[in-house]
């Protein structure tokens, strides 16, 4: 995948302002609320019975932070996403058996959350750049499945 200087700049200009724990928590919470079947991968997280329980769940918050800290590695080095996520792809495929469509869903939710947080700053160009990045990350995470 070729990345232009403009795409990289658009991505980092927003990501440098992201509160990763807050955005990670919100994005993972939204995934579990909007797509409730994804909750089956998080049964060890305790109470996920409703939106309020999910949004206040400490394990959801911690895992959201972990997921989007890892996503930050893709932001830092978009040319090496496949290598960066090789072990996570193996984990999610071989051990957790996560359907790869869920990676795409979480990427779309991240875009929604960033747009909500950054408003007018999240221009169509920024959105297109993030769309490309979340697609590349989702593909890398699904790599082990092919």
Curated annotation (Swiss-Prot):
Protein's name according to its UniProt entry: Hemoglobin subunit beta-1
Annotated function: Involved in oxygen transport from the lung to the various peripheral tissues.
Superkingdom of the source species: Eukaryota
Domain Globin as annotated: residue spans: 2-146
Any one GO biological process: hydrogen peroxide catabolic process
Organism: Drymarchon melanurus erebennus (Texas indigo snake)
Residues annotated as binding heme b: 63, 92
UniProt note on tissues of expression: Red blood cells.
Entry similarity comment: Belongs to the globin family.
Quaternary structure and interacting proteins, as annotated: Heterotetramer of two alpha chains and two beta chains.
N-terminal signal peptide: none
Residue ranges of coiled coil: none
Keywords noted in UniProt: Heme, Iron, Metal-binding, Oxygen transport, Transport
GO cellular component: blood microparticle; haptoglobin-hemoglobin complex; hemoglobin complex
GO MF annotation list: haptoglobin binding; heme binding; metal ion binding; organic acid binding; oxygen binding; oxygen carrier activity; peroxidase activity
């Amino acid at each position: 995948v070729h990345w232009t200087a403009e795409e990289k700049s658009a991505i980092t200009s927003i990501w440098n302002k992201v509160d990763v724990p807050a955005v990670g928590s919100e994005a993972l919470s939204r995934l579990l609320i909007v797509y409730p079947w994804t909750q089956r991968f998080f049964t060890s997280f305790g109470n996920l019975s409703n939106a309020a329980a999910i949004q206040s769940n400490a394990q959801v918050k911690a895992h959201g932070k972990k997921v989007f800290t890892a996503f930050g590695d893709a932001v830092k080095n978009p040319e090496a996403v496949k290598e960066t996520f090789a072990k996570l792809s193996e984990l999610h495929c071989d051990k957790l058996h996560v359907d790869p469509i869920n990676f795409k869903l979480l990427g779309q939710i991240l875009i929604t959350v960033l747009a909500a947080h950054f408003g007018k700053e999240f221009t169509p160009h920024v959105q297109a750049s993030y769309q490309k990045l979340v697609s590349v990350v989702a593909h890398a995470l699904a790599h082990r499945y092919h």
